[in-house]
Amino acid sequence: IREILKEEKIQEIIQSKDYNKGYKIVGNIPYYLTSYLLRLLMNLQSKQNKPKLVVLMVQKEVAERIVAQPPKMNLLAVLTQFYFQSKIIQIVKKGNFSPPPKVDSAIIKLIPLKNQYISNPKLEKKFIQLVKAGFSQPRKTLLNNLKTIIPKEKIEKYLLKNNLQLTIRPAALSLDDWLKIFQELVMN
């Protein structure tokens, strides 16, 4: 399956004439491929020929991580929400299947977003680097995680100016908070 899902193969398929007017991706994918497929879908967002809608059945716990909000934000949530409006449509209990799997499932709906960073590969890459650094050690403070890429004094000044505690953890920040941090600490 990974061979079929290689980004080059997907690009080849979607650049065919059948997909030039937009397309939707709908699937009940093997759960072990969820993060791999999400990364591919995120990579497609900066391309011209991207899906208009993605609907997937995934493991319930993964779906909950994708749509998480503060104080339960995580790397997957921030990045997915950067590219998509994300929503759980329905929970599918394991008892609805025969034989029943070990976990409950959820149907998620992902609608691609347009923002200034996705259309600029350099900014997109820098934003992703910022968020990855911020979540590099989720139990540590944002300040400790980001000081590897941004001077500590600059982070402290930003946090104080925006009435955020110096001990704030990355999970307490929304996507909007991350975008503001990016604008003020990385772009300036």
Give the predicted meaning of each segment.
Residues 1-132:
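Catalytic cores of RNA-modifying enzymes
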Residues 66, 158-159, 181:
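A structural signal for short hydrophobic/aromatic patches embedded in well-ordered alpha helices
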Residues 96, 106, 110-112, 118-155, ...:
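An accessory alpha-helical subdomain
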Residues 167, 171-188:
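C-terminal beta-strand-rich structural cap/linker in extracellular carbohydrate-active enzymes
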